[in-house]
Curated annotation (Swiss-Prot):
Family assignment from sequence similarity: Belongs to the multicopper oxidase family.
Binding site for Cu cation 1: 22, 371
This protein's encoding gene: LAC16
Domain Plastocyanin-like, chain residue ranges per copy: 7-88, 98-225, 318-451
Name under which the protein is recorded: Putative laccase-16
Lineage of producing organism: Eukaryota, Viridiplantae, Streptophyta, Embryophyta, Tracheophyta
Keyword Repeat: yes
Keyword terms: Apoplast, Copper, Lignin degradation, Metal-binding, Oxidoreductase, Repeat, Secreted
Length: 467
């Protein structure tokens, strides 16, 4: 187990910016104090203040990432974390000749003044194998990614090794990381330049929200090509899915939860003409929910309230194991599902060591990348339509399921995960589309202390930011 102390300071006083720092996919054993989400495990770092994060690495190995965790700050405040094998060990596959981090993100027109039209290249030699560490840091979209003329072999997801899978393209959700091997196996004398391309995947009608569906590209160029032959135009990935290609997107348990994921509305005070939030249908406010509960951030962080035993009035320990208003048989339009929701700061409390199964049921018209802090989980099942608790568990993969910290749940579909609650503390679970986090598509798991000192949460650091 490695422990690192890293000081984060907010010196942007002129912009009155507040900062929070989350290491996405780092489990932080017994140490929720340094996890980072705003008003869940700490209060914000105010301008000109600082806070020392204690980063604890345990079993993670591979590619993770870090980002701000307050509103939309992570649109630009993010970066890669690469955790190499321990000394004396190596990858569970042939060592690549080179490693290349690739960060996929979104371009926000409101934040930039000039756009430079330039292509950035990376050179490679024929016969070499390259490990591409792909990270989707975007706020709103799953991304397709491919390299023309080459296959990709997925060897790790969210810093956990997986059974190698060779594909023409990958689909990566916001918040996810994937390590993929690229073999530079084109024949000598063929084209020496190939496009590396990324394209967003959306399920909403394109005319619903103005959207630039352009494809981001970079150029992979072989450096050992005969100099006598001038380089031709790069080849484009022919198998990169279209922007709305939905087909391409597509034990023992102590605690079972069925969680409906939905985008809905909150009643709004339409008599207040200055209320800018009342922009939804019939003057309602846009919201999002888990099990018909739209999470409301408290005035003080949940972790402090739990630690001091003062949770009363801050949160309620009655997050439902099943939807409050169940909706059966979701279809493409999901007509008839409950559209109004209610606010609440409801959390789920579990005993240390509990094996938890969560089935996410997507009722909305878009995908949702669901992320759990403090844990990695097994993705044991997926399916389209309504989850059938009698039939569908028989289809679970309990032999070699992927081990991840973010799972993408397609629209009108379900995904089942399992994890052991062996990390005491307060842990945020949320959709990684930031607008949905702000709207309330989140909740909190509180894992109680175990009986031994090694199974108990670490003491509160003395320099935690004040609310």
């Amino acid at each position: 187990m490695d422990r690192k102390g890293i000081v984060l300071g907010s010196k942007l006083a002129v912009f009155s910016m507040i900062l929070l720092w989350h290491r996405h996919g780092v489990d932080q054993p017994r140490n929720p104090w340094s996890d980072g989400p705003e008003f869940i495990t700490q209060c914000p770092i105010r301008p000109c203040g600082n806070f020392t994060y204690q980063v604890i690495l345990f079993e993670e190995e591979g590619t993770l990432w870090w980002h701000a965790h307050s509103d939309f700050d992570r649109a630009t405040v993010h970066g890669a974390i690469v955790i190499h094998p321990k000394h004396g060990t190596t990858f569970p596959f042939n060592k690549p000749d080179k490693e290349i981090p690739i960060i996929l993100s979104e371009w926000w027109n409101d934040d930039v003044e000039n756009v430079l039209d330039e292509a950035k290249r990376t050179g490679g030699d024929q016969g070499n194998t390259y490990l591409l560490r792909v990270i989707n840091t975007g706020l709103t979209n799953d991304m397709f990614f491919a390299v023309a003329g080459h296959c990709l072999t997925v060897v790790s997801i969210d810093a956990r090794y997986t059974k190698p899978l060779t594909v023409d393209y990958i689909m990566i959700a916001p918040g996810q990381t994937m390590d993929v091997l690229l073999e530079a196996n084109r024949t000598l004398g063929s084209n020496s330049r190939y496009y590396m391309a990324a394209r967003a995947f959306i399920t909403l009608p394109v005319d619903t929200i103005p959207f630039n569906n352009s494809t981001a590209t970079a150029i992979v160029e072989y450096t050992d090509s005969p100099t006598a032959r001038p380089p031709g135009p790069p080849e484009f990935p022919l198998l990169l899915p279209a922007i709305k290609d939905e087909d391409a997107a597509m034990a023992f348990v102590d605690e079972r939860m069925l969680i409906d994921i939905d985008v809905n509305f909150l009643p709004c005070d339409t008599t207040n003409a200055t209320n800018k939030l009342c922009k939804g249908p019939q003057g309602n406010q846009f919201a999002a929910s888990l099990n018909n509960v739209s999470f409301e951030s408290p005035a003080i962080d949940v972790l402090d309230a739990y630690y001091y035993g003062s949770g009363r009035g801050v949160y309620e320990e009655d997050f439902p194991n099943k939807p409050v208003n169940a909706f059966v048989n979701p279809t493409g339009d999901n007509g008839g599902r409950p559209l109004l929701t209610k606010r609440g700061t409801k959390v789920k409390v579990v005993e240390y060591g509990t094996v938890v199964e969560v089935v996410f049921q997507d009722l909305s018209s878009e995908n949702h990348p669901m992320h759990l802090h403090g844990f990695a989980f097994y993705v044991v099942g997926r399916g389209s339509g309504t989850f059938d608790e009698r039939r569908d568990p028989a289809t679970y993969n309990l032999v070699d399921p992927p081990f991840q910290n973010t799972v993408s749940v397609p629209k009108s579909s379900w995904a089942a995960i399992r994890f052991r609650a062996d990390n005491p503390g307060v842990w945020f679970m949320h959709c990684h589309f930031d607008r949905h986090v702000v709207w309330g598509m989140d909740t909190v798991f509180i894992v109680k202390d175990g009986k031994t000192p090694q199974a108990q949460m670490l003491p509160r650091p003395p320099n935690m930011p004040e609310c």
